[in-house]
């Protein structure tokens, strides 16, 4: 690859041109244009692929205090987000057509213990065209460690309560979680306990996780899969790297001289292999599942799967191939 960069007098990159070449394949040229305001804050990034028309990846607007006020991606109004802050410049809300979220600190809400130290006392969100808020109320112990996340819906989070609660019922003296309960959907019309975990440690290293919950999560939800019942389910090397995870059926994890994982071997024979450059940059991943092998190569911001260009990564996401969609 060849990369050429133009800079402003203050050292900010104003144009970056990348030429990506692979023998026998089409040459790809990417050009990024960066625009800044009087305070050298990024205002806009445009992107041109080969001879296609340039597109705007990101637009930034700042308030009088220099905080990000809004951004828009790909020039699409639906991908706009507006940001609001309180008087302490703590994030208060993110709002947009596709997702909105509100964070509360000392603001009053039914059943909420107000927080004046920066802890979030409650949060709520809506996605897409949803009209009902979903959210959590949080409680903490005397060391500001999370104790309870209580789920609810509606303006005061009192509708459909407790469906997706999480409870941490104990910490050890070093702050490690000893017991954790998670609730979720257990059938088409019922909600209940899906995880009841007890965690044991050797110092700060997790040794085992035992789940005594009798119900599994329903549908496409996720819960902890207790794949082993051993005294030691997680094993580490002398550098503290995890080398075995019985709950995930990982029989071996190998590391290179940079302490980066270079192979993961599963008990069923499946494997993941990683290759890196001398600086630790990941260059290749090889997933082997049964008789199927998927090789992913990382060439700068270009990602190939089995030798075919899959995507080009950029500041706003990626360009997929061969359809060239942003």
Per-range role (PLM):
Residues 4-5, 34, 60, 81-83, ...:
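A residue-level detector for well-ordered beta-strand positions
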Residues 1-2, 28-30, 53-56, 77-79, ...:
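Short, small/polar residue-rich loop motifs at catalytic or cofactor-binding pockets
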Residues 2-46, 218, 222-227:
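Outer-membrane beta-barrel transmembrane domain signature of Gram-negative proteins
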Residues 25-93, 163:
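Structural signature of Gram-negative outer-membrane beta-barrels, strongest in the C-terminal barrel
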Residues 1, 101-134, 200-248, 293-326:
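Short, ordered secondary-structure scaffold segments
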Residues 87-95, 173-175, 179-204, 254-326:
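Short secondary-structure transition motifs
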Residues 1, 5-7, 15-23, 44-51, ...:
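Beta-turn initiation residues at beta-strand->coil junctions
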């Amino acid at each position: 690859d060849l990369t050429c960069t133009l800079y402003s007098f203050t050292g900010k990159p104003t144009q970056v041109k990348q030429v990506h070449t692979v023998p026998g394949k089409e040459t790809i040229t990417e050009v990024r244009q960066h625009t800044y305001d009087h305070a050298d804050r990024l205002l806009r990034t445009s992107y041109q692929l080969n001879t296609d028309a340039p597109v705007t990846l990101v637009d930034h607007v700042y308030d009088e205090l220099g905080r990000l006020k809004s951004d828009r991606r790909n020039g699409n109004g639906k991908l706009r987000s507006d940001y609001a802050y309180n008087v302490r410049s703590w994030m208060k809300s993110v709002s947009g057509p596709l997702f909105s979220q509100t964070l509360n600190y000392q603001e009053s809400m039914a059943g909420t213990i107000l927080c004046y130290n920066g802890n979030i006392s409650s949060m709520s969100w809506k996605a897409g065209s949803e009209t009902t808020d979903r959210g959590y109320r949080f409680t903490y112990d005397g060391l500001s460690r999370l104790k309870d996340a209580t789920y609810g819906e509606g303006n005061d989070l009192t509708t459909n309560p407790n469906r997706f609660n999480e409870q941490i019922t104990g910490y050890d003296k070093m702050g490690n979680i000893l017991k954790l309960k998670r609730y979720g959907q257990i059938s088409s019309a019922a909600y209940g306990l899906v995880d009841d975990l007890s965690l044991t440690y050797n110092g700060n290293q997790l040794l085992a996780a035992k789940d005594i919950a009798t119900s599994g999560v329903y549908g496409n939800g996720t819960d902890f899969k207790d794949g082993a019942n051993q005294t030691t389910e997680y094993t580490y090397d002398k550098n503290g790297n995890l080398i075995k995870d019985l709950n995930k059926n990982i029989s071996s994890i190998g590391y290179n001289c940079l302490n980066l994982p270079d192979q993961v071997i599963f008990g069923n024979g499946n494997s993941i292999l990683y290759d890196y450059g001398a600086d630790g940059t990941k260059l290749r991943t090889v997933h082997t599942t049964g008789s199927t092998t998927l090789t992913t190569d990382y060439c700068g911001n270009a990602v190939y799967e089995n030798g075919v260009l899959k995507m080009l990564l950029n500041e706003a996401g990626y360009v997929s191939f061969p359809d060239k969609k942003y």
